[in-house]
Design a protein with these regions (language model features):
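ER/Golgi luminal nucleotide-sugar-dependent glycosyltransferases, focusing on the catalytic module
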Residues: 1-581
């Protein structure tokens, strides 16, 4: 059977996602020819990958005009109508779905053997006041009986580049079914949704609003938008796909973590470090930056570093020459070596790390830690925080670096320390006050992905900025070239630039097209603790306050709140006195 696939691709970040590679790999054997039509620019390395892996036979780069139908039209035009009839079937498809969840060959064999079918698809939409019943256009396959018809040729020859998506749906997506049905051709879908009960649905578009039904009816593709639109059940959809289909659910997590912010709840469920054999390439250059403010804690870190099974360079920063001398003595006693730099007492552990820009840029993997204590809180706040962070981020470094070897992973952070699960310290209303600083830094770094931190309730961060990362993942932060003038002096106020940076790390990596992983806290705590901590009536709403800024400050407020009402009262009294006279 000689088949051709016209495959339309679009990615706003100009990348070819792994799920697209997988899709084409799984379907390659079905087609004699694959035409890859991209409505967005793609990187040269992706183009080379598609060619080297034989996932396409012809490439068409076009501007994103006219949506998918104009792209399919251009593909057919490039092939030439006289050559289209050489194929037994023509399949049009786009990359807006994950799959195939199951082997596609049986589907093709079934409909090719059915003489009552001239064209077929995955799902259809029932007739409404606006549209007639039609196959949804993310996948349609046309058999030879239809391809050879004048109706088929006329439909595609009349495609023009429409600019309104509703016009495309009305003129092309619905008409591609009705025009052929009216000409006497017959169609079927894997899931005929017109016969399905939709009374509990907002709209009878099963591909978008009811992904559970899609899986139940063994539709081999599930829409990307359906995952995003149904996040409340996405964990269970992913579990089903992982357990009941042949599709790697990780491809869904990876793609959604790139095209949307990577911290959605259903995505976080898949962010723990994977269990895998330790493998660290000897060629990788590794640096550990340790900021030592409390020299009495240095030995604790040196002992933790003994768990490493890889070579690394230790770079220590501190705030005074006296501490540098003390650190040298501790290193000498322990038999350890390090480069020690005095960086001052501004910027805590973050600015010292950023000042090492030129040196750290030479390394493949970088670990960043500091001798953590909490002067503002109880002893156990700093003690538990530090020891748990060491257990999560220092001792399992072999496993962390094994995970960082994956091209898609750029940063590893710690899970939430237990102190923050027993005590409500990170509060959504206070986080909201940090968001403007985060937005400002985002703009200053010139990052390209769109995000507004003020719309978010809280952030995924490595508490205390203990972190492992690839330099490229955080390069924009280093390129800010922050100085002491940009950092407030100690004692550090709340919601400072340092607090903003602590919260920004995984999002900076996301903008660089990296995902993150979380090193698990082995201190097991029942989630009922979180339930008790977070579900409180008292203090669940912010205290009422008055913002005088829009009134012109305190003087303006006095005018509106005191002087204005006083004048009104005086006027009323005068009117009453006149009436008596």
């Amino acid at each position: 059977m000689k088949r051709i696939l016209l495959y339309v691709h679009f990615n706003k970040y100009h990348k070819v996602s792994d799920h697209v590679y997988y899709q084409l790999e799984q379907m390659r054997a079905l087609f004699s020819k694959i035409v890859f039509i991209s409505n967005s620019d793609i990187h040269q390395e992706d183009l080379e990958q598609l060619e080297q892996r034989h996932l396409m036979d012809q490439f068409i780069q076009r501007h994103n005009k006219g949506y998918d139908f104009a792209a399919w039209h251009d593909g057919m035009k490039a092939l030439g109508c006289e050559h289209l009839v050489d194929f037994d079937s023509i399949t049009i498809m786009n990359d807006t779905c994950f799959g195939p969840l199951w082997d596609m060959k049986p589907y093709y064999l079934k409909y090719e053997a059915d003489e009552a079918v001239d064209f077929w698809g995955m799902t259809n939409n029932r007739a409404t006041k606006a549209f007639k019943e039609h196959i949804q256009s993310y996948f349609i396959s046309f058999k030879k009986s239809l391809v050879h018809s004048k109706e088929f040729r006329q439909f595609w020859e009349n495609i023009v580049e429409l600019t309104d998506v509703q016009d495309v749906i009305h003129n092309y997506e619905t008409r591609i079914t009705t025009a052929f049905v009216e000409a006497g051709f017959r169609y079927k879908t894997v899931f005929d949704t017109t016969k399905e009960d939709s009374s509990s649905m907002l709209h009878a578009d099963f591909s978008y609003y009811n992904p559970t039904a899609i899986l139940k009816h063994h539709v081999p593709f599930i829409k990307v938008k359906a995952i995003d639109a149904n996040q409340h059940i996405a964990p269970y959809l992913l579990d089903f796909i992982d357990q009941k289909t042949s599709y790697p659910a990780s491809l869904i997590v990876d793609h959604m973590s790139q095209v949307h912010p990577p911290d959605a709840k259903y995505l976080l469920a898949h962010k723990y470090l994977p269990e895998q054999p330790i493998s660290i390439a000897p060629s990788k250059k590794i640096a550990v930056h340790l900021h030592v403010f409390y020299a009495d804690l240095l030995s604790e870190f040196l002992e933790a570093f003994s768990h490493f099974h890889f070579d690394y360079d230790l770079l220590i920063t501190t705030d005074s020459k006296a501490k540098k001398a003390e650190i040298k003595g501790i290193l000498r006693e322990s038999g350890a070596s390090a480069d020690i730099l005095v960086t001052g007492n501004i910027g805590r552990d973050v600015l010292p790390m950023l000042t090492l820009k030129e040196r750290l840029s030479q390394y493949d993997y970088i670990g960043h830690f500091h001798t953590k204590k909490s002067k503002e809180a109880d002893f156990w706040a700093g003690q538990s925080w530090r020891t748990e962070l060491i257990d999560m981020m220092v001792k399992p470094a072999d496993q962390i670096l094994t995970t960082l070897a994956a091209d898609a992973i750029g940063i590893v952070i710690a899970d939430i320390p237990s102190f923050f699960r027993f005590n409500k310290i990170v509060d959504a209303w206070n986080e909201h006050l940090i968001a403007p600083e985060m937005n400002q830094l985002w703009q200053a770094m010139g990052l390209t992905k769109s995000i507004d931190f003020q719309t978010m309730d809280t952030f995924v961060m490595s508490y205390g900025t203990f972190v492992w990362f690839k330099y490229d993942a955080l390069k924009p932060l280093f390129d800010l070239d922050l100085s002491e003038a940009d950092i407030p002096a100690e004692p550090l106020p709340q919601n400072s630039i340092l607090h903003a940076i602590e919260r920004l790390l995984i999002y900076i990596a996301w903008d660089r097209h990296y995902d993150f992983r979380i090193s698990r806290n082995e201190k097991l705590l029942t989630p009922f603790i979180d339930n008790k901590l977070l579900n409180l009536r008292e203090g669940s709403v912010p205290h009422t306050y008055v913002d005088f800024d829009y009134m012109g400050g305190i003087k303006g407020a006095l005018k509106y709140i005191v002087i204005g009402p006083a004048k009104a009262i005086r006027y009323i009294i005068k009117r009453l006195l006149k009436r008596r006279v």
